[in-house]
Curated annotation (Swiss-Prot):
PANTHER family: TRANSCRIPTION ELONGATION FACTOR GREA (PTHR30437:SF4). It comes from Nautilia profundicola (strain ATCC BAA-1463 / DSM 18972 / AmH). InterPro entries: GreA/GreB_C_sf, TF_GreA/GreB_CS, Tscrpt_elong_fac_GreA, Tscrpt_elong_fac_GreA/B, Tscrpt_elong_fac_GreA/B_C, Tscrpt_elong_fac_GreA/B_fam, Tscrpt_elong_fac_GreA/B_N, Tscrpt_elong_fac_GreA/B_N_sf. Gene3D superfamilies: Transcription elongation factor, GreA/GreB, C-terminal domain, Transcription elongation factor, GreA/GreB, N-terminal domain. PROSITE patterns: GREAB_1 (PS00829), GREAB_2 (PS00830). GO terms for biological process: DNA-templated transcription elongation; regulation of DNA-templated transcription elongation. One of its GO terms (molecular function) is RNA polymerase binding. Keywords: Coiled coil, DNA-binding, Transcription, Transcription regulation. Pfam families: GreA_GreB (PF01272), GreA_GreB_N (PF03449). It comes from the Bacteria. The gene is greA. This is Transcription elongation factor GreA. Necessary for efficient RNA polymerase transcription elongation past template-encoded arresting sites. The arresting sites in DNA have the property of trapping a certain fraction of elongating RNA polymerases that pass through, resulting in locked ternary complexes. Cleavage of the nascent transcript by cleavage factors such as GreA or GreB allows the resumption of elongation from the new 3'terminus. GreA releases sequences of 2 to 3 nucleotides. Residues 44-72 form a coiled coil.
Amino acid sequence: MHKEPMTKYGYEKLSKELEYLKTTARPEVAKEIDSARELGDLKENAEYHAAKEKQSHIERRIAELSDILSRAVVVDPKEHAHNRVAFGSTVYLIDVDTDEKEKYTIVGAPEANPDKGLISYHSPLAKALIGKEVGDEVEVNLPGGVKVYEIDKICYEDICFS
């Protein structure tokens, strides 16, 4: 079984989602199926088929989350020195060409949300950053072309998934 690092925040978020699906969503959809079943003929019962589809989606997500969480190795970035970029680090970068500032936090793949600055440690940018120090320049091949960044700051920041 391949273990995957995950921040404690990502682990908590996925654990809460799994708990909700098991304790709330699953029983609710079971009631919907029972109610639709009482309407009669199941072949042409749109409510029944919609509820069964919803149930299938919930069960797939429960299985997916259970698998992800069973393989997770929770990493607390607070325990690491932040003189070098590592898993869980928040990194402030300066685009060398434009002087624009960007901020990214390196997280596990299931937690990644590039639109919110949460990048997977598998991503090209994270791979280029890991192990580097403040002042280092990194060159990254991105879909839009080659980018060069200077590392301005490395720290730990709490992650908010909302």
